[in-house]
């Protein structure tokens, strides 16, 4: 057993000295102190991860927990391996932290297998690039931003535009409609939201199909910089068992931010905007592990907080390079009360291509975007001169655009308790049929309010009837 001692503690950085063999970089070290209840000194169980070798038999480590109570001279044991976490079915329905310990007060996790969190991405020859659409049941995604099975989708948005609610709805739809396993990584987000998500999943019955991995805002940077890797390790196990897994990362920006904090603590020279010099390397190491192999697939959805709504921020730009599609959430659309507040003109997907989604889907999607684009161009004229000054064709375009805009909204299952409107899952063929009918002018006579917060197009007619509107045949 390789034993050393603590020689220096600066915040969450701990330097340790070993007389014999030095622990390797990324090895986990353990500090176990019994404490003294009589003196009010609590027990101490802390895991450290070796970050660098300093020379003179010293290593610099990052703490995976609070360093309160650490003193020089404490005994440190080298585990001889990286942090390992439990994987497999026993993890489903549970909340674990960065080192794989349960934090849901439901007893220990009886897992047979434990995997290290630092492993290489699958070899190029093991990967299986697929271009198949993944149905989400959310109209705006399925039509305009089709998800790739085994791909990576990024969700960009400032604070309070609905990123977390969309992720919760996606987990609900995957569990209820696809029977798939999901892994949720809470990276540096609010503990209250993590708790709400857990209770919501318990309430809606999807919890047995989800593994929750939390390293929230109150945790030290070492935890937030590693929690995504822990979640990915859990997901990789299910993929290698032949399953299609969904991993949700909320929020990938906090992963970068934690890396920046750790980098500063380790004394590295910062690069652009104060980020770590290894920004793209760290992002690449994480993203390359999210992939499809011959055995199974990992599809990921990553919420990306955009600081000050600036899409050119280096952290945001580093994520962009890895994505198959981008869902841009817009504050202007949220202000109109249209949720999910997805910007239909800014959001993109690699597979919105007739060779993948088919001609009809492609034509309808592009048709919707062109009508909305024309409406956007006409808004200045409407604001200055009024809608009456437009030509008859443009008036019709504006009326259809407003209906399309409202039809892109949808009631969510996970928001039922707040809105009182039952959630809707809309099949892809129903989505295409509905938007095609609006573009073809079949619903030009119905009021735009009837298109707001409904599921398939049939519900528009029902809603119009309830509003006392009779169709002109």
Swiss-Prot record:
Designated name of the protein: ATP synthase subunit beta
Listed PANTHER family: ATP SYNTHASE, ATP SYNTHASE SUBUNIT BETA, MITOCHONDRIAL
EC number assigned by the record: 7.1.2.2
Topology in membrane: Peripheral membrane protein
Binding positions (ATP): 157-164
Family indicated by similarity: Belongs to the ATPase alpha/beta chains family.
One Pfam family it belongs to: ATP-synt_ab_N
InterPro entries cross-referenced by the UniProt entry: AAA+_ATPase, ATP-synt_VA_C, ATP_synth_F1_bsu, ATPase_a/bsu_AS, ATPase_alpha/beta_chains, ATPase_F1/V1/A1_a/bsu_N, ATPase_F1/V1/A1_a/bsu_N_sf, ATPase_F1/V1/A1_a/bsu_nucl-bd
Cellular localisation: Cell inner membrane
Major enzyme class: translocase
Taxonomic source organism: Thermodesulfovibrio yellowstonii (strain ATCC 51303 / DSM 11347 / YP87)
Keyword Nucleus (UniProt): no
Catalytic reaction(s) noted: ATP + H2O + 4 H(+)(in) = ADP + phosphate + 5 H(+)(out)
Free-text function comment from the UniProt entry: Produces ATP from ADP in the presence of a proton gradient across the membrane. The catalytic sites are hosted primarily by the beta subunits.
Quaternary state and interactors: F-type ATPases have 2 components, CF(1) - the catalytic core - and CF(0) - the membrane proton channel. CF(1) has five subunits: alpha(3), beta(3), gamma(1), delta(1), epsilon(1). CF(0) has three main subunits: a(1), b(2) and c(9-12). The alpha and beta chains form an alternating ring which encloses part of the gamma chain. CF(1) is attached to CF(0) by a central stalk formed by the gamma and epsilon chains, while a peripheral stalk is formed by the delta and b chains.
CC annotations in GO: plasma membrane; proton-transporting ATP synthase complex
GO molecular function: ATP binding; ATP hydrolysis activity; proton-transporting ATP synthase activity, rotational mechanism
Record has Translocase as a keyword: yes
Residue pairs linked by disulfide bridges in the UniProt entry: none
Primary site of residence: membrane
Domain of life: Bacteria
UniProt keyword list: ATP synthesis, ATP-binding, Cell inner membrane, Cell membrane, CF(1), Hydrogen ion transport, Ion transport, Membrane, Nucleotide-binding, Translocase, Transport
């Amino acid at each position: 057993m390789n034993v050393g001692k603590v020689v220096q503690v600066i915040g969450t950085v701990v330097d340790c000295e070993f007389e014999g063999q030095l622990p390797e970089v990324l090895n986990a070290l353990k500090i176990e102190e019994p404490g003294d209840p009589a003196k009010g000194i609590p027990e101490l169980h802390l895991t450290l991860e070796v970050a660098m070798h300093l020379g003179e038999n010293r290593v610099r480590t990052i703490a995976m927990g609070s360093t309160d109570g650490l003193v020089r001279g404490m005994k440190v044991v080298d585990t001889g391996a990286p942090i390992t976490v439990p994987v497999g079915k026993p993890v489903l329905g549970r909340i674990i932290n960065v080192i794989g310990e349960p934090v849901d007060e439901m007893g220990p996790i009886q897992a047979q297998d434990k995997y290290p969190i630092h492993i290489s991405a699958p070899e190029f020859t093991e990967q299986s690039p697929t271009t198949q659409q993944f149905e989400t049941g959310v109209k705006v995604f399925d039509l305009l931003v089709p998800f790739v099975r085994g791909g990576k989708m990024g969700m960009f948005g400032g604070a309070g535009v609905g990123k977390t609610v969309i992720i919760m709805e996606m987990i609900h739809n995957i569990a209820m409609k696809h029977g798939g396993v999901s892994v949720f990584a809470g990276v540096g987000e609010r503990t209250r939201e993590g708790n709400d998500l857990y209770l919501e999943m318990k309430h809606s019955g999807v919890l047995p199909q989800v593994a929750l991995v939390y390293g929230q805002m109150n945790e030290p940077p070492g935890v937030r910089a590693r929690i995504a890797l822990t979640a990915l390790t859990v997901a990789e196990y299910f993929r290698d068992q032949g399953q299609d897994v969904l991993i949700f990362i909320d929020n990938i920006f906090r992963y970068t931010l934690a890396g920046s904090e750790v980098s500063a603590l380790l004394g590295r020279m910062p690069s652009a905007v104060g980020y770590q010099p290894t920004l793209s390397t760290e992002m690449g190491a994480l993203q390359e592990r999210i992939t499809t192999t011959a055995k199974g697939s990992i599809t990921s959805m990553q919420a990306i907080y955009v600081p000050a709504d600036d899409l050119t921020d280096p952290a945001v730009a580093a994520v962009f390079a890895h994505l198959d599609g981008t869902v841009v959430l817009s504050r202007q659309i949220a202000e109109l009360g249209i949720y999910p507040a997805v910007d239909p003109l800014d959001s993109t997907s690699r597979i919105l291509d007739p060779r993948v989604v088919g001609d009809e889907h492609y034509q309808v999607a592009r048709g919707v975007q062109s009508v909305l684009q024309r409406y956007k161009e006409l808004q200045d004229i409407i604001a200055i001169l009024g809608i009456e000054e437009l030509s008859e064709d443009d008036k019709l375009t504006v009326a259809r655009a407003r209906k399309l805009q409202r039809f892109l909204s949808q009631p969510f299952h996970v928001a039922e308790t707040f809105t009182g409107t039952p959630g809707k899952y809309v099949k892809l063929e129903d989505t295409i049929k509905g938007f095609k009918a609006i573009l073809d002018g079949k619903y030009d006579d119905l009021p735009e309010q009837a298109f707001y917060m409904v599921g398939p197009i049939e519900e528009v007619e029902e809603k119009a009837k309830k509003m006392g509107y009779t169709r002109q045949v």
